[in-house]
Amino acid sequence: MQPKGNKYGTHRVIEPKGVLPQPANKLDNNMDVLYDNEILIDVQTLNIDSASFTDIHNYAKQQAGEGAPVEKVMEEVKKEMLLNVELQGKHRNRRTGSGGMLLGKVEKIGDALKGKINLKEGDRIATLVSLSLTPLRIDEILEIRPEVDQVDIKGKAILFESGIYAKIPNDMPEKLALSALDVAGAPAQTAKLCQYGQTVLILGAGGKSGMLCCYEAKKRVGVTGKVIGIANSPKSTQRIKDLGFCDVVESAAGMTPVQVYEMVERLTDGKMADVTINCVNVPDQEMTAVLCTKDDGIVYFFSMATSFTKASLGAEGIGSDVNMIMGNGYTKGHAEFTLQELRESPELRKIFEELYA
């Protein structure tokens, strides 16, 4: 008889007791015992959160030493990932606090869930809850793909009863679906936040979440609205220009928040943005977003590199009366919503296939 589990997975928390799995310092990742309300997953790929992978990669380069070959850097990435799991029983970045998601096959379903959910053993799924709360065991790291933040492994994971997931669709490659589902909350939230005729600013427009948000924002604001895409690297700037989803595309490479503010002020004739969406995967972008948004406007911080303290105190410090939404990656129906964008837009699907599939 399987032991009874808590809906939210608190039975897997080792330390400190009484907290939920996400903030817990350590989880029980023993996969030999399955609780009655858990789903055991045979893991194929970890899709590491962009902010987390960027941090791990930068840390690995420091550890490997200046000028170290790529192979040495990747070995350091492996060490850091394995250490995260060894110390915590899950893959939560010890500096950013963020995780990611995974792709795998349902290996076993707890007795209390069998027949009550739309899953069966053998189904291929992507988890839509963070790796920062998912019990994980890594047996072997097979391949690291730093350009897409994906790591193929041999290992097991647990999805709790409250955990959400998406079945991998039949009409697109698994890696393509995984890459889109990783950021599914961003375009779905964009659809809720943007209205006809508004000016929408997207920071990090040339990245994975940024491209999806640009596409959705333009649909929502229509011909009388304006979508401004700001990217960083020359490559990402050209990428979002070529897609044609934005009315204006600019590069912010090497610019300070004040310089970006002055650029947006010029582009909007001093009116600033109604909605600003921050998809940048590095820290210290909070004030750029706040400065560029008009009073009573909305700033949506999708990036996991966001500091609530910097955003809230920074906004207060300049007397900015903006409404801030902090990294809410979930909204109802977000998985199917985002996959549908790839079906709707041949341009978007093509670039995602080239970059991520």
Predicted segment positions?
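Local beta-strand N-terminus motif with an aromatic residue
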Residues: C246, D269-D274, G317
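C-terminal capping/lid region of NAD(P)-dependent oxidoreductase domains
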Residues: G270, L339-A357
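Mid-domain Rossmann-like dinucleotide-binding core that forms the NAD(H)/NADP(H) cofactor-binding site
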Residues: M172-E250
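Glycine-rich phosphate-binding loop and adjacent beta-alpha segment
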Residues: V280-S345
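Glycine-rich helix-loop-beta junction characteristic of Rossmann-like nucleotide cofactor-binding loops
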Residues: T190-Y196, T268-G270, L291
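Glycine-rich beta-strand-centered segment in the early N-terminal region that forms part
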Residues: D32-N47, A60-L131
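Short amphipathic alpha-helix with an adjacent loop that forms part of the alpha/beta core around
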Residues: P257-K271
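NAD(P)H dinucleotide-binding glycine-rich loop of Rossmann-like/cofactor-binding domains
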Residues: V85-H91, G100-L103, A112, I125-G197
